[in-house]
Amino acid sequence: MKHRVKHIHFVGIGGVGMCGIAEVLHGLGYTVSGSDMADGATTKRLAAEGVRVFFGHDATYVEGADVVVTSTAVKADNPEVLAARDKRIPVIPRALMLAELMRFKQGIAIAGTHGKTTTTSLTASVLGAAGLDPTFVIGGKLTAAGTNAKLGLGEFLVAEADESDASFLHLTPVMAVVTNIDADHMDTYDHSFDKLKQAFVDFLQRMPFYGRAVLCVDDPNVREIRERVTKPVTTYGLDDSADIYAENVRAAAGQMHFDVVVKNGAITRFPLVLNLPGRHNVLNALSAIAIGLECGASIEAIQKGLSEFAGVGRRFQRYGEVKAQDGGSFTLIDDYGHHPVEMAATLAAVRGAFPDRRLLLAFQPHRYTRTRDLFEDFVKVLSGVDALLLSEVYAAGEAPIVAADGRALARAVRVGGKVEPLFVEDIADMPQAILDAARDGDVVVTMGAGSVGAVPGKVTALAG
């Protein structure tokens, strides 16, 4: 690519999926520029590194670019996209640029409906502890690195593979993980679950003949597609039929302790402490262990990488103790969960880490279509908390859908009779609503994929 492409321009450079790729390309010596609607921590960091960042969108911003990279959030009538097409400058999706990056390295792609960001982060941590200095592009900020992307000197590149728009079918990794397959983003697959599952098969089949698929056999849908995958496969799970499995799993002080069993001709066993709560994170760690072993990491490096894992932004991110208005304090945690399956897993992890504590959930639904398609599943998981604050749906560009909004969810939960929800229409009012509702000793979880991510910081600021 480098002999023809010198200047790469990103439309929407501040997006979590775009900034990491831009950062790595800048580190490789390309001229990188980009535009975004607003200034923020990400655009400030890119500008400080020497990336030229424009605000707003204008046709002149693509001057001199050899290629323009867009995300799915960028519309076809964006003035920069129109100008690029008029000038015959190639316009490509971010996944195609990620695929080009993988040509520089040995690509490791992490796919699945849930757990991609955490699993990618755990894998990067394991490879880093092994001295393999991986390049990584992650959908959240890796706490230890202070960023969501890094250009390493090693041969491996670890990145998330996004099924939401089927763009993972652009990638050609040498190793690929599938954590699970659930019904989400079904518009992309004509509302056919069979098409969604086949897309994961097609993704795995894009690996070379020497590639390796790492599959979670605890997930029934992953188990089902396994027979369609002709590449070498390593399985993992809590089930002892897997090639790599965990036994003696127990929670302690916000961590998970377990023994790892590896079937590799002989049986290898070793103890492990994962610095994350939840059985779902044990599964995520097992896939990172499988990748680590495949890449030559020692058991000691794997143990170090997982026991010292410092977390990733908005994935069970702890904000510590916050002053409660009734005296004492409550524990504040923030999480990106926005699908009922991942919400249930996170809330189960909270219950395990903080037994016998009242659980207050402040949830912002994400997308009207998801709320409509999974309405009863949302009602079920929301009804399992002790106290509930519910905001209006974060639209993410969608038009409202009747009976698939925040008020409808609140009514349905109320009818169930297990918890009395408080509807907070404007997310800007959520920080004060949390302080009004939280009691001494509570565990408060803010959750969702939209603007709720700004709420915990405002809660701590208001509490003083």
UniProtKB/Swiss-Prot annotation:
It catalyses: UDP-N-acetyl-alpha-D-muramate + L-alanine + ATP = UDP-N-acetyl-alpha-D-muramoyl-L-alanine + ADP + phosphate + H(+). One of its GO terms (cellular component) is cytoplasm. SUPFAM superfamilies: MurCD N-terminal domain, MurD-like peptide ligases, catalytic domain, MurD-like peptide ligases, peptide-binding domain. Pfam families: Mur_ligase (PF01225), Mur_ligase_C (PF02875), Mur_ligase_M (PF08245). It comes from the Bacteria. It is found in: Cytoplasm. ATP binds at G112, T113, H114, G115, K116, T117, T118. Pathway: Cell wall biogenesis; peptidoglycan biosynthesis. GO terms for biological process: cell division; cell wall organization; peptidoglycan biosynthetic process; regulation of cell shape. One of its GO terms (molecular function) is UDP-N-acetylmuramate-L-alanine ligase activity. Cell wall formation. Belongs to the MurCDEF family. This is UDP-N-acetylmuramate--L-alanine ligase.
